[in-house]
A protein has these predicted regions:
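PRPP-associated nucleotide enzymes
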Residues: 1-107
Length: 107
């Protein structure tokens, strides 16, 4: 009603962070559950490289790159672990908008 509320389900005691924050949406300087976003992205790249090496996938490539901004640390982690050179063929130009979303206040 307008003057009260009813709890349908009590909140849990455990925090569950969406993996999308670590892999894409979270800023590099942010930390979730005590883990820095940039560090997690490097780790993800490292794990991908280890997986590819174990399965003999993508070993005959010239360089590793990521799509800016969030993909770059993944690629650096991959390159560092695999020994394959990192390169930046894509450079994102963002003079005013922090993310690739269309601003709601367009004029």
């Amino acid at each position: 009603t307008a003057n009260s509320f009813r709890v349908l389900k009590e909140s849990g005691n455990e925090t569950k962070i969406c993996a999308f924050l670590w892999s894409y949406y979270g800023y590099s300087t942010s930390c979730y559950e005590g883990i820095n976003v940039e560090v997690m992205r490097y780790r993800n790249g490292k794990i991908m490289a280890q997986n590819d090496k174990e399965n003999n996938i993508a070993q005959d490539i010239d360089y590793v790159s990521g799509v800016p901004d969030s993909g770059t640390p993944h690629a650096i982690g991959y390159a560092n672990e695999s020994g394959i050179q990192f390169a930046r063929p894509f450079i994102k130009y963002t003079p005013t908008w922090a993310r690739s979303f269309t601003p709601s206040n367009q004029s």
